[in-house]
Amino acid sequence: MTEPNRVAEVRRDTAETKIRVRVDLDGTGVARLATGIGFFDHMLDQLARHGLVDLEIEADGDLHIDGHHTVEDVGITLGQAFAKAVGDKKGLRRYGHAYVPLDEALSRVVVDFSGRPGLHMRVPFKAGMIGALDTQLVYEFFQGFVNHAGVTLHIDNLHGDNAHHQCETVFKAFARALRMALERDPRMAGVIPSTKGSL
């Protein structure tokens, strides 16, 4: 029996931003990204490559003010796209976790496609800006994603002296955790991974 494609496209159009996101959860890590914030694109590329998710993101935001609306709204729209692509969650492994190092930095991410949004993030960034990305906005991105994907997400940077390294380990670990959680479990085919019978 052929598994259904897990592909979704979502658009978000507000007075502040215009966003288009397309995801293929069973991709090969191909990314086409244009958010207007170079380092943010770099992090989203890590998400695609290490999560093996094909990802297209186009964002036209009010960057003349700052990056807040753009980064947050990309998180919201990406979360909506993931939720749409995942569907009823039948056969999903559901849980994923990963530790990822980069030189002195080490981060751990744990995700649960629980249907219950919750973000617990502890990342003491060593700098306020990485390129054109305000590090405070990393939290806003993940909060937007969590609320609209319906996941519980724990993010901990365990070590790190360089903000670029800290951020990169967070996004790579997030990608690897997603990849694990989104895998289809052949022993759970057609079954929702919860004793409640729904997520």
Curated annotation (Swiss-Prot):
EC number(s) reported in the record: 4.2.1.19
PROSITE patterns attached to this UniProt entry: IGP_DEHYDRATASE_1, IGP_DEHYDRATASE_2
Annotated GO MF terms: imidazoleglycerol-phosphate dehydratase activity
BP terms from Gene Ontology: L-histidine biosynthetic process
Keywords: Amino-acid biosynthesis, Cytoplasm, Histidine biosynthesis, Lyase
Reactions catalysed: D-erythro-1-(imidazol-4-yl)glycerol 3-phosphate = 3-(imidazol-4-yl)-2-oxopropyl phosphate + H2O
Subcellular localization: Cytoplasm
Pathway: Amino-acid biosynthesis; L-histidine biosynthesis; L-histidine from 5-phospho-alpha-D-ribose 1-diphosphate: step 6/9
UniProt GO cellular component terms: cytoplasm
Stored PANTHER family: IMIDAZOLEGLYCEROL-PHOSPHATE DEHYDRATASE (PTHR23133:SF2), IMIDAZOLEGLYCEROL-PHOSPHATE DEHYDRATASE HIS7 (PTHR23133)
NCBIfam families: PRK00951.1-1, PRK00951.1-5, PRK00951.2-1, PRK00951.2-4
Record-stated family: Belongs to the imidazoleglycerol-phosphate dehydratase family.
Protein name, as recorded: Imidazoleglycerol-phosphate dehydratase
Organism: Methylibium petroleiphilum (strain ATCC BAA-1232 / LMG 22953 / PM1)
